[in-house]
Amino acid sequence: MVLHLTSLALSHFRSHKVARLALDGRPVAIFGPNGAGKTNILEAVSLFSPGRGLRRSSAEDMARRPEALGWKLSGVLQSLSQVHEVDTWSDAGAARQVKIDGKAAAQTALGRIARVLWLIPSMDRLWIEGAEGRRRFLDRMTLSFIPDHAQVSLEYDKAMRERNRLLKDMVRDPHWYAALELRLAETGSAIHANRLQALSDLAAAQSGAQTAFPAADLTLQPGEMGMPDTVEDLRAALADGRMRDLAAGRTLIGPHRADLYGAYAAKGVPAKDCSTGEQKALLVSLILANARALAQDFGAPPLLLLDEVAAHLDADRRAALYDEICALGAQAWMTGTETALFDSLGNRAQYVEVTDTDGLSTARPL
């Protein structure tokens, strides 16, 4: 079974006025100078999954300037035994829309037909910056295993915004809180359980794997207030904590307060204390473990988006990465400034050269 794009078209997306790629399922090596528009192609592929893509941008910001006419992406997705035509677009700053096989669909529906994971340069500081980035990284992996995680997360965020609004307005009437806290407890408990399941799946995929990259021990750490085990316990904790939350002006218990702890397993060293090279290797290892797990769980490895990853690995690690990607059968989209970075891939990949002329990107398959 496979998961890959067989075609991709960009219209007025970022620096690309028009780009069309025909694809055969092999990894895609995209090369060209810095600023040419390589990452914009990876961002386009990331939008074949729910959410705001690898840059977390608004739909309006993705439109080509100065026209700002809106943008459109179209792709043909081979997903296991099915072929889907997928379109996603935004009209002049409007919210992103999705069609699957010609029918309007919610973004969350993309999670049922595609799995997309990425590593981008801003994630290099994942282990040493704030918990929000680590939660986002964990939730992206969780979403790859459990497509409904996107919807339950949206529902949780909506309920929390509403409760926080009550707290900031110093509303004390318990009737205003009861329904919101039940919804927070139901969705929050589901988020917590989903994350734990994803971590279990990742641990199993790392155990005994033949890989050149170091295994990571991952632990989900609750916030200072802990994380109750059941829906009823979380609901009660939210109710009991109202006065505390009123003083803070926000909700202080729930999965939005959690953190992801990582350690270099063989050394027993916290990821935050590892060298930058080791931290990068741990991230690559986790992405590959996620891909191995999905090959078993979903039936095919995910689409992998690796932006400037090759440049930060030595030649041996680079070759090992390519070997693992090809052994998995994953369609990995990789960027680099020169073709030499992909020498050890050889004819196992398709190559696309991206150039820029006065702010207009051109993508040329070789």
Give a label for each model feature.
Residues 1-33, 47, 175-186, 190-303, ...:
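Conserved NTPase motor "head" modules and their coupling/switch loops across ABC/AAA+ ATPases, GTPases
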Residues 125-126, 132-178:
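Long, charged N-terminal accessory/stalk domains
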Residues 335-337:
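H-loop/switch region of ABC-family ATPase nucleotide-binding domains
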